Design a protein with these regions (language model features):
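Short beta-strand segments at enzyme active-site cores
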Residues: 16-23, 57-62, 161-163, 197-206
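Structured C-terminal cap/extension of enzyme domains
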Residues: 190-225
Length: 225
């Protein structure tokens, strides 16, 4: 709630729209002992409270078809994780909730392969967004091919650039994903320059103690620029 409150103040001052994203369950972690959540219902109630308190839309990930209806009761947008972006049963279940569906492009896919987002439309839901989150570059790095943003926009869907996840350095021997947060501003500016419809940035008051993804987060004090 503290972070949401601060970001709301920043975005209101800058007169830009803001959507709050939070995971109620971190299902895809590098190690068995990694933090996965505070409990599904408790976390989803926090997301609902963010919406009710600050009046901003909220987003959360779902990982299986049976999660779709549950999560849809609490948030405005359901997000399909990159590693699950082609799972037909997951896409159809999400579509049937009637919520806006944000599909993250798999690191292993070309932008043009994201045409399978039509599965959501064919299931009766035209409210679709796509997210660019980088492409696998060797074993332990990602790069952003900015051509992919207009390519995916050509399908008729808004395209978001996930800045911080695009700067992850996966598959580290430590078992913890690394990152390059010093490049967040550069990647964000480039995404805006090529016409991304929005940018996603993970932020925290102290990334070093964040429960997940701290290595690629932007320190909250730096968010306003």
């Amino acid at each position: 709630m503290r972070i949401a409150e601060r970001v709301v103040k920043i975005t209101e001052a800058l007169q830009i729209p803001y959507v709050f994203k939070g995971s109620y369950r971190k299902a895809n972690r590098s190690r068995l002992d990694s933090f996965t959540g505070i409990g599904d219902e408790k976390a989803l109630k926090v997301l609902r409270k963010v919406h009710e308190t600050f009046g901003v839309p909220t987003v959360t990930d779902i990982h299986s078809a049976d999660e779709a209806a549950m999560a849809a009761e609490y948030v405005d947008v359901l997000q399909i994780p990159a590693f699950l972006c082609r799972q037909t049963d997951l896409l159809v279940a999400a579509a049937k909730t009637g919520k806006t569906i944000n599909i993250k492009k798999g690191q292993f896919l070309s932008p043009l392969a994201m045409q399978f987002a039509d599965k959501v439309v064919e299931a009766g839901n035209k409210n679709v967004m796509l997210t660019e989150r980088g492409t696998t570059f060797g074993y332990q790095d990602l790069v952003v091919d900015y051509r992919g943003i207009p390519e995916m926009q050509s399908f008729g869907y808004p395209v978001i650039l996930d800045v911080t996840h695009s700067l992850q350095q996966p598959n580290q021997t430590s078992g913890v994903t690394g990152g390059m947060p010093q490049l967040i501003e550069t990647v964000a500016k480039a995404g805006i320059a090529v016409g991304a419809d929005g940018i996603f940035i993970e932020t925290h008051e102290n990334p070093a103690v964040a429960k997940s993804d701290g290595a690629n987060m932007l320190k909250l004090d730096l968010l306003e620029g």
